[in-house]
Amino acid sequence: MKKFKYSFILVFILLFNIKDLTYAQGDIGVGNLRNFYTKHDYIDLKGVTDKNLPIANQLEFSTGTNDLISESNNWDEISKFKGKKLDIFGIDYNGPCKSKYMYGGATLSGQYLNSARKIPINLWVNGKHKTISTDKIATNKKLVTAQEIDVKLRRYLQEEYNIYGHNNTGKGKEYGYKSKFYSGFNNGKVLFHLNNEKSFSYVLFYTGDGLPVSFLKIYEDNKIIESEKFHLDVEISYVDSN
């Protein structure tokens, strides 16, 4: 009887620890998503030259104290960028040997509009619609990565609606703090509605395995779009999972 009792206690402890580990990993994802998208300084480089190294899926640049390596699974696109002057925009994370890594974020340098275009946005907040046009989500590039627009959008949503919690603007308090992000939201997506191509979307609250190397991988294809031929449809809401 004692043996059975001790076995039961051991199983209970193991299950409890697994639950705690999962919860902790979830917390890591929440914190990392908030920090990397809204507090981390993003990469914004103009006219930097790729080192033209023989690694098919990587671009590499010198940025002073660190090398910056951009990885992509779009080998055809990357091959066109080898040795060229590029503009780089995106979120980096720490890699081995003091290098900074990121996914995609590359466009050819020198292809600019006469003036920056504010990206038109349809925004639904808990089902209520409004339109947005702001300098904070704009670009002067003729061809821009989806990553650049998505990063700027998320930072704007954090500042105005506190989607990831703990913003420093004081805005968004009216939506409460009921989600695990300590905000009023846990569900949402951004749809890139292209004029002449198939639309695509990103989930705004996707945390992957909790680490940036995982949740930033959505930009691995270095998706590039014509900046004058799309708008955004954005939805944010709260979904009770109970």
Where are these regions (language model features)?
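Proteolytic cleavage junctions
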Residues: 205-242
